[in-house]
Amino acid sequence: MQVILLDDVKALGKKGEVVNVSDGYARNFILPKKLGLEATPKNLNDLKLQKAAEAKLAQEILEQAQALAKEIESKSILLKIKSGEGGRTFGSVSTKEIAIALKEQLGHDIDKKKLVLNDPIKNMGTYTVPVKLHPKVTAELKVKVDSL
């Protein structure tokens, strides 16, 4: 019997896959536990429509991320912090400060976890900070650190 899986089933398949199982396994385990549906033409058509809608939504999210990446890369943000002699800062600039400045100056509320900063910024100057907007889209944000 062919079954459309509604949930991941160990050693059988992932959600949305159509798999062949024995009639008894389908009737006694998969169907009663609502782990799958019988693969009727109507259910297969519903699955096809659902996958098409999910693909369209994923494409829209990707396009939004690409548009945001273009906007972020075309602009830069300025951070003013206290500094001592030789351009050394008191403290450091972390992803939290960059995310706050990004929201205030450009109006984009981006989570600090999406900003990739290997080490905190401790000197004055201009830096490029990668921003992971989507698994397939990374933008380069220009951050200028200046003294007060």
Swiss-Prot record:
Question: Which first-to-last residue range defines the signal peptide?
Answer: none
Q: Which organism is it from?
A: Lachnoclostridium phytofermentans (strain ATCC 700394 / DSM 18823 / ISDg)
| InterPro entries reported for this sequence | Ribosomal_bL9, Ribosomal_bL9/RNase_H1_N, Ribosomal_bL9_bac/chp, Ribosomal_bL9_C, Ribosomal_bL9_C_sf, Ribosomal_bL9_N, Ribosomal_bL9_N_sf
GO cellular component term of the entry, any: ribonucleoprotein complex
Q: In the record, what terms sit under GO molecular function? A: rRNA binding; structural constituent of ribosome
What is the name attached to this protein's record? Large ribosomal subunit protein bL9
Manganese as UniProt keyword:
no
Task: Provide the family line.
Answer: Belongs to the bacterial ribosomal protein bL9 family.
**Gene3D superfamilies cross-referenced by the UniProt entry:** Ribosomal protein L9, C-terminal domain, Ribosomal protein L9, N-terminal domain
